[in-house]
Each structure stands twice: as C-alpha cells, then as structure tokens.
From Swiss-Prot:
InterPro entries named among the record's database cross-references: NadA, NadA_sf, Quinolinate_synth_type2
Record bears the keyword Aminoacyl-tRNA synthetase: no
The name this protein goes by in its record: Quinolinate synthase
Catalytic activity, as annotated: iminosuccinate + dihydroxyacetone phosphate = quinolinate + phosphate + 2 H2O + H(+)
EC number in record: 2.5.1.72
Pathway(s) where this gene product acts: Cofactor biosynthesis; NAD(+) biosynthesis; quinolinate from iminoaspartate: step 1/1
A cellular component annotation (GO) from this entry: cytosol
Gene Ontology biological process terms from the UniProt entry: 'de novo' NAD biosynthetic process from L-aspartate
Annotated HAMAP family: NadA_type2
Molecular functions (GO terms): 4 iron, 4 sulfur cluster binding; metal ion binding; quinolinate synthetase A activity
Organism: Cyanophora paradoxa
C-alpha cells in the first residue's frame, strides 16, 4: 500500500473518531443543560434516531399530549413539528416551550387555513367539529373536540348518532373512521403529503419479494393503500402490534422514523419501509427531519425559538384538547 493511501486511511479513521467524540460531547452537553434548566425533551416517533435516543419521552400525538399535560418540567423542548409544540404550549401556557426549528411545519395542518375553515364551519353550523390534532392552534380553537389517530374511532363512537359531525383536516383518517364507525362524517379535504406518496404498485412489488410479510399502515394513508393492510393503527399501535405479532417480517407504510423503535424492540424481526413510486426519500417527512441534535442543543442553550400563542386562541384551543383527554381516559 502506498504512503498516500496509508495516510488517507489514517485521516479517515481520525475523522471518524473525532465525529464520534463530538457526538458524545453533544449528548453530554444536552443532558447537562436539561438538568440545569429542569427541562424535558418530548419527541415524536418520526424524528431522526439520534433525537429519539436522547428524548425523555417518545410517543405518538396522543401520548405526547398526555405527557405534556402532566410534566413538572419548567421547560418543554419539543422535538416534533409546530402543531405538536403548540399543543404542549396550550396545555402549559405558563411554561417555556421550545421547538428546535420553527420551520418544522406540517403539510396536513397547512391544508386547513383558518380563514377558509371558519367559513366552512359557519356553513355547517349544526355540525359538531372534531379536529385531528394535526392542525394549527387556530383550528383547534374553532373545534369542539380534538382527536388523534389513536382515539379518533373511539371518540366518534361516543358522539350521539343524531349529532352531525364535521371532521377535519385529514380526509383519509376521516374515511378510515367512517369505515370503522359507519358514521356519515362531513370531511374537510386535507391530507398529509408523506402518507399520499405510497402506491399499490410498490405494495405488490414488496409482497412478491416478501410473501410472508405482514403489511401494517397508518390511517392517514389513502383507502387504496389501507385495503391491503393486515393491520392499521397509530404509530404507538403499530409498534405494539409488531411486538406482539408472531410474524417476523413487516412492510411498514408510514413515515420510516418509527422503524428505529421497531428494530430496538424486536431486533430479531425485519422491517421494510415501503418506498414511493419514484424511489425517492419522499416517505420521510421533510418537516420532521428539520430538527437535529445540534438544533435541539442550541434551542436549549439560547432558550429559543419559543412557541407563542395569542391568549384568546390559546384559551379556546385548550378546551377541545382537554375534552379529548377526558374522553380518552
């Protein structure tokens, strides 16, 4: 081997060691700040693995809302997207809530502009408004009850049959709820860009490659996708399902961040993230992936960016969230 190649190899090893040391130091700094600030890190399953591993609590929207409602921490660092951090602030108006990147929005939340939704609601004033938690604080403030993918079916089932329901903003989750409850819901035409990238073609391809695999999917997917699923559920529900299943191979149809926890829980099993038709990384949420360990550290160090919500919106948005938590207990 030439001296040049040896030197290059040494440089690569040195660089890798430096990166590893920097990573360890970053983790230590985050843990120190967390203790000094009496902070808690809440993270969604769709976050990158490094953030999942440093979180104090990891969960789906319902679990995160419950945790935010009961935390004794002074500062909540929310590793998720904007509407999730807003929910934490609504439940804890006196606490500081930090979001590592304020640009971490949500295509589903953006598909329901408050001004337009307000007019839609007025046109159907006899309807009870049940909104999926994946919406802005302004939409929550116009809602009667909030739901998540984990409890949407149960909540709708608790509403009297004579009461018309307006369900927003996810039409795909709404269609799933209709299929499970038999209710005639009025749906707002919103959707998640990630969960609409999947195709039947790719399901068939993967099923031919892995004939014994079970297909598991999130209810934000389109009906044409869900009809091929052996199991449909929220991220927490999907995780619990693979833990209990006797099957060893799963085709996972949702944002692939959840697979990190599936592999940790069941290292002996195989989890296959269903790709999009184009084969790009479009099944990864671009908003969730804006958060990084470095941004999380900087948010704690600088106490910014903070989530702020006008008091009038905050107070009105809190009622339907609390009603959801009461109905889910």
């Amino acid at each position: 081997m030439s001296i040049f190649l040896k030197n290059k190899q040494f440089e690569n090893i040195t660089s890798q060691e430096q990166t590893k040391n920097n990573y360890k130091q970053l983790i230590n700094d985050i843990q120190t700040l967390k203790k000094d600030l009496n902070a808690i890190i809440l993270a969604h399953y769709y976050q990158e693995p490094d953030i999942q591993d440093v979180a104090d609590f990891l969960g789906d929207s319902l679990g995160l809302a419950r945790e935010a409602a009961k935390t004794n921490a002074d500062i909540i660092v929310f590793a998720g997207v904007h509407f999730m951090a807003e929910t934490a602030k609504i439940l804890n108006p006196e606490k500081m809530v930090l979001l590592p990147d304020l640009n971490a929005g949500c295509s589903l939340a953006d598909s329901c502009p408050p001004e337009i939704f307000s007019e839609f609601k007025k046109a159907h004033s006899d309807h009870l408004v049940i909104s999926y938690i994946n919406c802005s604080a302004s939409i929550k403030a116009m809602s009667d009850i909030i739901c998540t993918s984990a409890n949407a079916v149960d909540i709708v089932n608790k509403i009297p049959l004579t009461q018309p329901i307006l369900f927003a903003p996810d039409q795909n989750l709404g269609r799933y709820v209709i299929s499970k409850t038999g209710r005639d819901l009025l749906l707002w035409p919103g959707s998640c860009i990630v969960h609409e990238t999947f195709s039947e073609k790719k399901i068939f391809e993967f099923q031919s490659l892995y004939p014994t695999a079970e297909v598991i999917a999130h209810p934000e997917c389109e009906p044409t996708i869900l009809k091929h699923a052996n199991y449909i559920g929220s991220t927490t529900s999907l995780l619990q399902y693979v833990k209990n299943s006797k099957k060893t191979t799963f085709i996972v149809i949702t944002e692939p961040g959840i697979i990190h926890q599936m592999k940790k829980s069941c290292p002996e099993k195989q989890f296959l993230a269903l790709p999009t038709v184009s084969g790009c990384a479009c099944n990864e949420c671009p908003h969730m992936r804006l958060n990084t360990l470095e941004k999380l550290y900087l948010a704690m160090k600088t106490r910014s960016p903070q989530i702020e919500i006008p008091e009038s919106i905050l107070l009105n948005a809190k009622k339907p969230i609390e009603r959801m938590l009461e109905m889910s207990n």
